[in-house]
Amino acid sequence: MVKETQYYDILGVKPSASPEEIKKAYRKLALKYHPDKNPDEGEKFKLISQAYEVLSDPKKRDVYDQGGEQAIKEGGSGSPSFSSPMDIFDMFFGGGGRMARERRGKNVVHQLSVTLEDLYNGVTKKLALQKNVICEKCEGVGGKKGSVEKCPLCKGRGMQIHIQQIGPGMVQQIQTVCIECKGQGERINPKDRCESCSGAKVIREKKIIEVHVEKGMKDGQKILFHGEGDQEPELEPGDVIIVLDQKDHSVFQRRGHDLIMKMKIQLSEALCGFKKTIKTLDNRILVITSKAGEVIKHGDLRCVRDEGMPIYKAPLEKGILIIQFLVIFPEKHWLSLEKLPQLEALLPPRQKVRITDDMDQVELKEFCPNEQNWRQHREAYEEDEDGPQAGVQCQTA
């Protein structure tokens, strides 16, 4: 039982979520709320990053589960020390962190929705991207030659320092992006700015790229287009990073190289055998057979070798197809009372039980728990002198 669930709620996962589920949740939310796409969601992006930083670290997650956010704060001498949200994003998507960003232009990260069929068969998709490119008219200068000057407000630092009093004898130093030069450290007189880029040095350009999704690739796998990201003056262009996002499939679930599916069979089929067909992800039809005399129990697993997912970079090799059988039992009174002895004669004999006078005979009814956990209501009943509240119910008919 965790103390609080705020970080889990931010990522939209349960406290029992696996590390892979936490990574997948962060990936989707970080791409959705990244400042480049949602400039007004900076605080949301920050909270998502903080939640992921804690829950992706087994030690921090354990501390959080036991003591909540307060325990995280106490573990950091009174205030939690979180990494930069952009550093977390870049490390997750392969950007390399702040130092790499200072030497290179921004990476452009895009999520590409794919089906399980796409990952099984391979597919090529075209993706239209918007990216920054150096302005050809001013060659990345931003204006006329010689018109660029050091920003007088921040003295070329790109940042402003503000001193704020937060209490008697206590002040706080706050660093913000310079409002005059927008963090560039330099400015251009409006009349001298380039007409094409308005002094921004770069312009937005649409580009179509072809993304080759190879057989066996996985959900969350990254495809890198080196040097195709945003361009900035005097910096090496960033990369375009495509992140595959697999849609849920109606029949199959993927587990590594294997495929898992559930198949319903009638009780007669479970006892007497059957032939069934399965449509594969490349539209072939498989015929599976359970021979007469073989008994399949509810929940039993069977497998078909070499019918799982192709293995990435070795597509001629495949995992296995795992089938879980769900046996459907007949409805009540499906057979007349007169015919039940005939059925019983065909089935294994019932276990005989010796009943004595000191035994209590009780009535067996269907268990129908309501939406709330029946154990909690039982505990409440034990503590409540007035008797049970609304809890476990049994059908009366």
From Swiss-Prot:
Q: Where is the J domain?
A: 4-70
> CXXCXGXG motif repeat boundaries?
135-142, 151-158, 178-185, 194-201
Pfam name, any one: DnaJ_CXXCXGXG
- Protein topology in the membrane: Lipid-anchor
Cited InterPro entries: DnaJ, DnaJ_C, DnaJ_domain, DnaJ_domain_CS, DNJA1/2-like, HSP40/DnaJ_pept-bd, HSP_DnaJ_Cys-rich_dom, HSP_DnaJ_Cys-rich_dom_sf
- Location of Phosphoserine modifications: S18
Give the positions of lipid attachment, kind S-farnesyl cysteine. Answer: C394
Q: List the disulfide bonds.
A: none
What is the superkingdom listed in this entry's lineage?
Eukaryota
Protein's name according to its UniProt entry: DnaJ homolog subfamily A member 4
Q: Does the keyword Cell inner membrane apply?
A: no
Keywords annotated in UniProt: Chaperone, Lipoprotein, Membrane, Metal-binding, Methylation, Phosphoprotein, Prenylation, Repeat, Zinc, Zinc-finger
Q: Cellular component terms, GO, for this chain's entry?
A: cytoplasm; cytosol; membrane
Key word Phosphoprotein present? yes
At which positions is Zn(2+) 2 bound? C151, C154, C178, C181
Chain positions found as Cysteine methyl ester:
C394
Which stretches does the record call CR-type zinc fingers?
122-206
Its main localization is membrane
Q: Which GO terms describe its biological process?
A: negative regulation of endothelial cell migration; negative regulation of inclusion body assembly; positive regulation of gene expression; protein refolding; response to heat
